[in-house]
């Protein structure tokens, strides 16, 4: 028998105690990795179609401290986590041309018109909210599915403190 912390431990239990110690260490490491460094978010809805589909799991980094245009980020708004793409950074100017394309600092950034010019009243209503200077400390976010306007076109720029991390990869998991 061997004494551990003043308690005598029979020899047959020593391998189990070593295993238990390794498991505790492993669980602590996993907690640190996924509680502090990384996170996993679930895509909810069709706002990021076709790139991120409803129900997909996305690995994101919580440690990201500098974002760039076109980064996909997880953010929180009104208690709900959502994914969106950064269209413009703080202090950049977002504008819309007469064909409905969004521009950042004078350069067309959207791959297609974000607002149809067929419905003139809707187009003019959206067009009249531009040009828009992104305030310091905020980001202008845009969904990949332009028909879903639940993004900065509707509620303005998002505070940097509401960005939870940068998407790194989708996780291909079945039947969850």
What are these regions (language model features)?
Residues 2-17, 21, 39-42, 50-176:
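Soluble "head" domains of membrane/secretory-pathway proteins
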Residues 20-37:
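Hydrophobic membrane-insertion alpha-helices, especially the h-region
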